[in-house]
Structure formats: C-alpha cells, structure tokens
C-alpha cells in the first residue's frame, strides 16, 4: 500500500504535536511503522487520506457499537447542532441521558456527566475518598483508568504498550496511596483487606480488562471483591468505560450479576463524541456539589450535541436481540481467526465477551497481566501489519482489546477471515524460512 499522504502528514504532525499524535498508542510505536491518517469512516470501514479502505475492529476504541456514521446518530447530531453547539447551562437532553442510564444500569440512581473516561474515574475516586474519609485506593495490574496521577501505576493501555511502570511527574507520595494487586488473584485481595481494609477508600477495577487486551474475570472473582468491599466498608468502583453498554446492555455488572457502588462510563454514551459519566446510589451521589461538599465541575459537561448523539445510540442498542447478534458475530470472528492460526501452525488464543475480544499469541488461556505480557508480541506485530496490508485494521498494540459492531455483517467477517488465512500463512512461511536460515550447517 502507498501511504505517501499519511507519511507527509505524520512528518508534519511531529513538528507541532508531541510524537505526532494526540494519544500515544496511535503512533504505532508498539507495532512499528507509521500510522495511517483517517479521512472518513462509515459503517464497518475506515478510509485513509491515501484512498485505502480498512475493515475496522478498533471502533474508536469501543464506542462505535452500531458502526461509524450511523444515519440515526448523524441525524440526531445535525438536529442538535442546528440549535447551538454548547450552552454552559442545563438542557433537557442531560436529564434524558441521566434517566436513560439509570433505567438501563440499576446501580446508578443518580448520574453526573463529565467530558471523558479519565474525568469520570478521577471524579469517582474523589467522591470515594470524600465519602469514606480514607485515602488509599486499590487498582489492578494492567487495568487502565485514564491518565490521572493516581492510576499511572502499572497501568494498562498506552502505559503497557510503552513499557512504562509509571510516569514521570507523578509524585511518589501520591503513588504510595495507590495499591496495585494482581487481577484474578483471590488470595492477594483477601490478604490485603485483612491487613489494611479499614484504610481503603475504594477498589477500582475494569470488570473485564480491556487495556491489557481482553481478560475476563475468573468465576466468582468480582463477587469476591464485592464481598470484601462490603465487609470493610470500602466502595467498589466498576470502570465500565469499555464494558459499559458493550458486553451487555446493562454492562459487565449485569452480565456477571455484581453490583458496584459507583460506575464510570466513557464515550459510548456520547455516540463516540467526547463524553463520560459516573453514577451510583443516591446517598453517595448526593455528596457531589452543589448537593453536597465534594467539588466537581465542567464547562462542557452535558454538552447538548454529545447528549443527542449518545441518546440516539442508546436507543439503537435497545433493539431486540441486538447483543445476541453482536456476540454471535464476535464469536464467529474469534473462532475463524483461531482456526486460521491453527491451520498455519501458529499458536494463538482468542477471548471474547459480547462484542469485545482479544487476540493472544500463545497456546494458553490468559487470566492475568503477567500472562498477557508473556505472549509473543513480535508475532502479533507481524499479524497486525499483514492484516493492515490486506485492508483490516486491528488495534496497533498487542495489549488492546478489539471491538465489533452491528455493521460487521457475515460478509465482512468472512472477508476478514479470508485476509487472516493469507496473513497467517505468510507469517508461517516467514518463520519457516527464518528457522531454516538459523539451522546449523550439516557436515558431510
């Protein structure tokens, strides 16, 4: 593929934008090469500035669950724009959004809109500390909760991609208030709570890790966290920025039957536009200003255009059997990819929850951050580029989940699998040639 226009833009971008991108993973540092620049998106496709089309399994990192540029979402945005872009004052759409989330996610009696997933998690932690009078928080290796200082300790997503255990600029004293546990380790959680449970304000967790690829909880693990938090009066926060309205209509908490105290949401509730929210029980949320003393604010929170886009999308995903079809499509994709890898003699495992999936280049199921980082990332990188050359775009990191949308029809899935069969065979052939070149010379 010729990416001359993308190359020119990337060179130009690096003169004004740090690293040439506005979020690190986009730079392709993990997989090598240079990013393509997008001109437009429609349905299951992205189109770059050089005229290439890609089947997209990134979906703007999750929110494009009905595909890109869906007519109903686009029309809702056009109507909203005709009435103004931003008010800095309350609007009816904010109320409708809060009521919709509360109806679909019963743990959220009340909801506060913010502008991003990071804002949502930062606000939830402040609320937890203010409401409990405690300072320590617990997170898990490989989980990513945005770029707030408290969270950049063994974080997932871009932190994991760049191999950074933390970030310069995070005060050591603040880091001491963040305790990191191994996800899916029952005994480690129990031991920590027995040692210092009464000093912990909150446990924040991705109920399905989506920022160290796609790692579901072991049976009973989320309930174990719920039991410990209840016993020690610790708030349990589910970061559903990725899983909310993605793995099930009611999110991961509905799928696994575990009720958190607070939930954070991301851009899926804005139809892909910049937005976030956090919610919980009424007694807890009443601590937020102006109802209570814990301050949180935002000029653009509840933006009318974002609310309109989000409401249109939330209406679409309530269609009968929406999630059944989404899950079936993702399962067909994962099964086909695993079969294609196996036929080429390549070890690969897939993991899938609803419309969210992960590709691990290993022959083992992955249940922890350590297992995820032990996978063959070089082989993933080769697969990524082989698929990109064939017009299929997966996340440019071995540590990011993939996403499917309702626009990914059976024909789209089959086109992806056809590309994958060719890609895996190419990788297998390259490996065979390399193996032969490294074999010791046979003496006559």
UniProtKB/Swiss-Prot annotation:
Main location as per UniProt: cytoplasm
GO biological process, one term: protoporphyrinogen IX biosynthetic process
Superkingdom of the source species: Bacteria
Positions of modified residues (N6-(pyridoxal phosphate)lysine): 267
Cofactors, names only: pyridoxal 5'-phosphate
Keyword Cytoplasm assigned: yes
Documented EC number(s): 5.4.3.8
Subunit structure, interactors included: Homodimer.
Name assigned to this protein: Glutamate-1-semialdehyde 2,1-aminomutase
Classification of source organism: Bacteria, Pseudomonadati, Pseudomonadota, Gammaproteobacteria, Lysobacterales
């Amino acid at each position: 593929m010729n990416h001359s226009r993308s190359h020119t833009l990337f060179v130009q971008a690096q003169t004004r934008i740090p690293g040439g991108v506005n979020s690190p993973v986009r730079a392709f540092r993990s997989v090598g090469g240079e990013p393509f620049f997008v001109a437009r998106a429609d349905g299951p496709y992205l189109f770059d500035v050089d005229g290439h089309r890609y089947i997209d399994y990134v979906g703007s990192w999750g929110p494009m669950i009905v595909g890109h540029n869906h007519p109903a979402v686009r029309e809702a945005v056009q109507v909203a724009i005709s009435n103004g872009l931003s008010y800095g004052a309350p609007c009816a759409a904010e109320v409708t959004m809060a009521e919709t989330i509360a109806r679909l996610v019963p743990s959220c009696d009340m909801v506060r809109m913010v502008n991003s997933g990071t804002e949502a998690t930062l606000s939830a932690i402040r609320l937890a500390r203010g409401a409990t009078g405690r300072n320590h928080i617990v997170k898990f290796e490989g989980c990513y909760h945005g770029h707030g200082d408290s969270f950049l300790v063994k974080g997932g997503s871009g932190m994991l991609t760049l191999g950074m255990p933390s970030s310069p600029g995070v005060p050591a004293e603040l880091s001491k208030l963040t305790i990191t546990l191994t996800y899916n380790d029952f005994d480690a959680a129990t031991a920590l709570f027995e040692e210092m449970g009464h000093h912990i304000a909150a446990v924040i967790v991705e109920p399905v890790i989506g920022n160290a690829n796609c790692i579901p909880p072991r049976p009973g693990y989320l309930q174990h966290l719920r039991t410990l938090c209840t016993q020690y009066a610790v708030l349990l926060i589910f970061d559903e920025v990725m899983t909310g309205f993605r793995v099930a209509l009611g999110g991961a908490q509905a799928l696994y039957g575990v009720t958190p105290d607070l939930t954070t949401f991301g851009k899926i509730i804005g139809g892909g536009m910049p937005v976030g929210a956090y919610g919980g029980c009424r007694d807890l949320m009443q601590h937020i200003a102006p109802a209570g003393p814990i301050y949180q604010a935002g000029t653009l929170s509840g933006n009318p255009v974002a609310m309109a886009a989000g409401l249109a999308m939330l209406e679409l995903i309530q269609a009968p059997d929406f999630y059944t079809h989404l899950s079936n499509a993702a399962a067909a994709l994962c099964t086909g990819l695993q079969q294609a890898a196996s036929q080429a003699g390549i070890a690969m495992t897939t993991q899938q929850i609803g419309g969210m999936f992960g590709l691990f280049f290993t022959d083992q199921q992955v249940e922890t951050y350590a297992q995820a980082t032990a996978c063959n990332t070089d082989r993933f990188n080769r697969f990524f580029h082989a698929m990109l050359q064939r017009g299929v775009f997966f996340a440019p990191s071995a540590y990011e989940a993939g996403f499917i949308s309702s626009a990914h029809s059976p024909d789209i899935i089959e086109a992806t699998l056809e590309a994958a069969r060719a890609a895996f065979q190419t990788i297998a052939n390259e490996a065979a040639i390399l193996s032969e070149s490294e074999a010791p010379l046979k003496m006559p």
